[in-house]
Swiss-Prot record:
The gene is pyrH. UMP binds at residues 57, 77, 138-145. Homohexamer. GO terms for biological process: 'de novo' CTP biosynthetic process; UDP biosynthetic process. Its main location: cytoplasm. This is Uridylate kinase. Allosterically activated by GTP. Inhibited by UTP.
Protein backbone atom coordinates (compact mmCIF):
# COMPACT_ATOMS: atom_id res chain seq x y z
CA UNK A 1 0.00 0.00 0.00
CA UNK A 2 1.32 3.45 -0.90
CA UNK A 3 2.01 5.55 2.15
CA UNK A 4 2.35 9.28 2.64
CA UNK A 5 5.91 10.50 3.05
CA UNK A 6 4.79 12.79 5.87
CA UNK A 7 2.35 12.33 8.73
CA UNK A 8 -1.20 13.53 8.03
CA UNK A 9 -1.51 15.00 11.55
CA UNK A 10 0.66 17.62 13.25
CA UNK A 11 -0.84 17.45 16.74
CA UNK A 12 -2.83 14.53 18.16
CA UNK A 13 -4.64 13.63 21.36
CA UNK A 14 -4.11 9.93 22.09
CA UNK A 15 -6.77 8.41 24.36
CA UNK A 16 -5.61 5.20 26.03
CA UNK A 17 -7.94 3.13 28.19
CA UNK A 18 -6.63 2.00 31.55
CA UNK A 19 -7.52 -1.56 30.56
CA UNK A 20 -5.06 -1.32 27.67
CA UNK A 21 -2.24 -1.16 30.23
CA UNK A 22 -3.24 -4.23 32.24
CA UNK A 23 -2.36 -6.88 29.66
CA UNK A 24 -3.57 -10.39 30.42
CA UNK A 25 -3.39 -9.87 34.18
CA UNK A 26 -6.84 -8.30 34.34
CA UNK A 27 -5.63 -5.70 36.82
CA UNK A 28 -2.80 -3.23 37.33
CA UNK A 29 -0.09 -2.27 34.86
CA UNK A 30 1.82 -4.66 32.59
CA UNK A 31 5.33 -3.19 32.32
CA UNK A 32 5.99 -4.74 28.90
CA UNK A 33 2.82 -3.18 27.43
CA UNK A 34 3.69 0.17 28.98
CA UNK A 35 7.16 0.06 27.42
CA UNK A 36 5.77 -0.92 24.00
CA UNK A 37 3.33 1.99 24.09
CA UNK A 38 6.15 4.35 25.08
CA UNK A 39 8.16 3.15 22.07
CA UNK A 40 5.19 3.70 19.74
CA UNK A 41 4.70 7.22 21.12
CA UNK A 42 8.46 7.82 20.69
CA UNK A 43 8.11 6.96 16.99
CA UNK A 44 5.49 9.68 16.61
CA UNK A 45 7.70 12.25 18.35
CA UNK A 46 10.55 11.31 16.00
CA UNK A 47 8.18 11.94 13.06
CA UNK A 48 7.68 15.48 14.38
CA UNK A 49 4.16 14.89 15.71
CA UNK A 50 3.07 16.73 18.86
CA UNK A 51 1.46 14.23 21.24
CA UNK A 52 -1.01 14.79 24.07
CA UNK A 53 -2.10 11.69 26.00
CA UNK A 54 -5.17 11.05 28.15
CA UNK A 55 -5.24 7.72 30.03
CA UNK A 56 -8.22 6.11 31.74
CA UNK A 57 -8.04 4.46 35.15
CA UNK A 58 -10.15 1.32 34.78
CA UNK A 59 -7.18 -1.01 35.29
CA UNK A 60 -6.73 0.29 38.83
CA UNK A 61 -10.16 1.41 39.94
CA UNK A 62 -13.74 1.06 38.73
CA UNK A 63 -16.23 3.26 40.55
CA UNK A 64 -19.39 1.79 39.04
CA UNK A 65 -19.33 -1.39 41.12
CA UNK A 66 -18.75 0.46 44.38
CA UNK A 67 -21.46 3.00 43.47
CA UNK A 68 -23.92 0.10 43.25
CA UNK A 69 -22.76 -1.02 46.69
CA UNK A 70 -23.63 2.41 48.07
CA UNK A 71 -20.46 4.48 47.68
CA UNK A 72 -21.08 8.14 46.86
CA UNK A 73 -20.54 8.68 43.12
CA UNK A 74 -18.45 11.82 43.67
CA UNK A 75 -16.09 9.91 45.98
CA UNK A 76 -15.84 7.07 43.45
CA UNK A 77 -15.06 9.49 40.63
CA UNK A 78 -12.38 11.21 42.69
CA UNK A 79 -10.78 7.80 43.28
CA UNK A 80 -10.98 7.14 39.54
CA UNK A 81 -9.23 10.45 38.84
CA UNK A 82 -6.38 9.44 41.15
CA UNK A 83 -6.13 6.11 39.29
CA UNK A 84 -5.55 8.03 36.04
CA UNK A 85 -2.77 10.00 37.74
CA UNK A 86 -1.12 6.72 38.79
CA UNK A 87 -1.29 5.51 35.18
CA UNK A 88 0.09 8.87 34.05
CA UNK A 89 3.05 8.57 36.41
CA UNK A 90 3.78 5.10 35.03
CA UNK A 91 3.56 6.35 31.43
CA UNK A 92 5.77 9.37 32.13
CA UNK A 93 8.38 7.07 33.68
CA UNK A 94 8.22 4.69 30.69
CA UNK A 95 8.65 7.61 28.27
CA UNK A 96 11.61 8.97 30.23
CA UNK A 97 13.22 5.52 30.15
CA UNK A 98 12.70 5.58 26.36
CA UNK A 99 14.50 8.97 26.30
CA UNK A 100 11.34 10.91 25.48
CA UNK A 101 10.73 14.24 27.19
CA UNK A 102 7.32 14.05 28.85
CA UNK A 103 5.36 16.19 31.29
CA UNK A 104 2.51 14.97 33.48
CA UNK A 105 -0.30 17.42 34.23
CA UNK A 106 -3.27 16.86 36.51
CA UNK A 107 -6.69 18.52 36.48
CA UNK A 108 -6.65 18.38 40.30
CA UNK A 109 -3.70 19.91 42.20
CA UNK A 110 -1.16 17.32 43.38
CA UNK A 111 1.81 19.45 44.34
CA UNK A 112 5.08 17.56 44.42
CA UNK A 113 3.67 14.76 42.25
CA UNK A 114 2.91 16.47 38.94
CA UNK A 115 2.10 19.87 37.44
CA UNK A 116 -1.33 21.47 37.57
CA UNK A 117 -3.06 21.43 34.20
CA UNK A 118 -2.62 24.67 32.28
CA UNK A 119 -3.93 25.03 28.75
CA UNK A 120 -1.28 27.60 27.74
CA UNK A 121 1.56 25.61 29.31
CA UNK A 122 0.38 22.39 27.62
CA UNK A 123 0.41 24.03 24.19
CA UNK A 124 3.84 25.56 24.85
CA UNK A 125 5.23 22.13 25.84
CA UNK A 126 3.71 20.48 22.75
CA UNK A 127 5.30 23.11 20.51
CA UNK A 128 8.63 22.18 22.11
CA UNK A 129 8.08 18.50 21.23
CA UNK A 130 7.32 17.39 24.78
CA UNK A 131 4.76 14.63 25.21
CA UNK A 132 2.07 16.00 27.54
CA UNK A 133 0.14 13.47 29.65
CA UNK A 134 -3.15 14.94 30.84
CA UNK A 135 -4.45 13.12 33.92
CA UNK A 136 -7.31 13.31 36.46
CA UNK A 137 -9.94 13.50 33.73
CA UNK A 138 -11.68 16.88 33.56
CA UNK A 139 -11.20 17.36 37.30
CA UNK A 140 -14.95 17.03 37.79
CA UNK A 141 -17.05 14.02 38.81
CA UNK A 142 -19.65 12.59 36.40
CA UNK A 143 -17.37 13.09 33.37
CA UNK A 144 -15.58 10.17 31.74
CA UNK A 145 -11.99 10.13 30.54
CA UNK A 146 -13.41 10.06 26.99
CA UNK A 147 -15.00 13.44 27.79
CA UNK A 148 -11.61 14.57 29.12
CA UNK A 149 -9.94 13.41 25.89
CA UNK A 150 -12.36 15.39 23.72
CA UNK A 151 -12.22 18.45 25.98
CA UNK A 152 -8.42 18.48 26.09
CA UNK A 153 -8.27 17.72 22.36
CA UNK A 154 -10.34 20.84 21.66
CA UNK A 155 -8.35 22.95 24.14
CA UNK A 156 -4.93 22.01 22.73
CA UNK A 157 -6.27 22.36 19.17
CA UNK A 158 -5.45 18.77 18.26
CA UNK A 159 -6.09 17.67 14.67
CA UNK A 160 -7.73 14.45 15.85
CA UNK A 161 -8.55 12.31 18.89
CA UNK A 162 -7.06 8.84 18.41
CA UNK A 163 -9.05 6.44 20.58
CA UNK A 164 -7.03 3.30 21.22
CA UNK A 165 -9.20 0.24 21.84
CA UNK A 166 -8.99 -3.57 21.91
CA UNK A 167 -10.73 -3.91 18.51
CA UNK A 168 -9.69 -2.74 15.04
CA UNK A 169 -12.31 0.01 14.73
CA UNK A 170 -16.06 0.61 14.87
CA UNK A 171 -18.14 -2.41 13.83
CA UNK A 172 -21.75 -2.96 12.79
CA UNK A 173 -22.09 -5.16 15.90
CA UNK A 174 -19.85 -6.46 18.69
CA UNK A 175 -17.30 -8.62 16.80
CA UNK A 176 -16.75 -10.74 19.93
CA UNK A 177 -20.42 -11.79 19.88
CA UNK A 178 -21.29 -11.55 16.18
CA UNK A 179 -18.75 -13.09 13.75
CA UNK A 180 -20.58 -11.52 10.79
CA UNK A 181 -19.93 -7.98 12.10
CA UNK A 182 -18.12 -5.77 9.61
CA UNK A 183 -15.91 -2.76 10.29
CA UNK A 184 -16.67 0.75 9.08
CA UNK A 185 -13.78 2.63 7.48
CA UNK A 186 -15.47 6.01 7.81
CA UNK A 187 -18.58 7.38 9.52
CA UNK A 188 -20.17 10.77 10.07
CA UNK A 189 -21.04 11.96 13.58
CA UNK A 190 -24.74 11.71 12.75
CA UNK A 191 -24.42 8.14 11.43
CA UNK A 192 -22.86 7.10 14.75
CA UNK A 193 -25.70 8.74 16.68
CA UNK A 194 -28.47 7.45 14.40
CA UNK A 195 -27.19 3.86 14.52
CA UNK A 196 -26.37 4.10 18.24
CA UNK A 197 -22.86 2.78 17.62
CA UNK A 198 -20.73 2.58 20.75
CA UNK A 199 -17.76 4.85 20.09
CA UNK A 200 -17.68 6.79 23.36
CA UNK A 201 -20.26 8.15 25.77
CA UNK A 202 -22.75 10.67 24.45
CA UNK A 203 -21.39 13.69 26.37
CA UNK A 204 -17.88 13.11 24.98
CA UNK A 205 -19.08 12.35 21.46
CA UNK A 206 -21.38 15.36 21.13
CA UNK A 207 -18.58 17.61 22.43
CA UNK A 208 -16.32 16.36 19.61
CA UNK A 209 -19.13 16.73 17.06
CA UNK A 210 -20.01 20.28 18.12
CA UNK A 211 -16.38 21.34 17.74
CA UNK A 212 -15.79 19.33 14.54
CA UNK A 213 -13.01 17.33 16.20
CA UNK A 214 -12.38 14.13 14.19
CA UNK A 215 -12.13 10.83 16.08
CA UNK A 216 -10.26 7.77 14.86
CA UNK A 217 -10.83 4.45 16.61
CA UNK A 218 -8.05 1.87 16.20
CA UNK A 219 -6.51 -1.18 17.87
CA UNK A 220 -3.53 -0.25 20.05
CA UNK A 221 -2.73 -3.94 20.59
CA UNK A 222 -1.83 -4.22 16.91
CA UNK A 223 1.88 -3.39 16.59
CA UNK A 224 2.50 -0.44 14.27
CA UNK A 225 -1.19 0.53 14.07
CA UNK A 226 -0.61 3.92 15.71
CA UNK A 227 2.10 4.82 13.21
CA UNK A 228 -0.10 3.69 10.30
CA UNK A 229 -2.91 5.91 11.55
CA UNK A 230 -0.77 9.05 11.67
CA UNK A 231 0.73 8.28 8.26
CA UNK A 232 -2.75 8.26 6.76
CA UNK A 233 -2.85 4.55 5.99
CA UNK A 234 -6.00 2.43 6.07
CA UNK A 235 -6.29 1.71 9.77
CA UNK A 236 -9.26 1.84 12.09
CA UNK A 237 -12.45 3.89 11.66
CA UNK A 238 -12.49 7.64 11.05
CA UNK A 239 -15.45 9.63 12.38
CA UNK A 240 -15.84 13.11 10.99
CA UNK A 241 -18.47 15.47 9.60
Amino acid sequence: MATNAKPVYKRILLKLSGEALQGTEGFGIDASILDRMAQEIKELVELGIQVGVVIGGGNLFRGAGLAKAGMNRVVGDHMGMLATVMNGLAMRDALHRAYVNARLMSAIPLNGVCDNYSWAEAISLLRNNRVVILSAGTGNPFFTTDSAACLRGIEIEADVVLKATKVDGVFTADPAKDPSATMYEQLSYNEVLDQELKVMDLAAFTLARDHKLPIRVFNMNKPGALRRVVMGEKEGTLITE
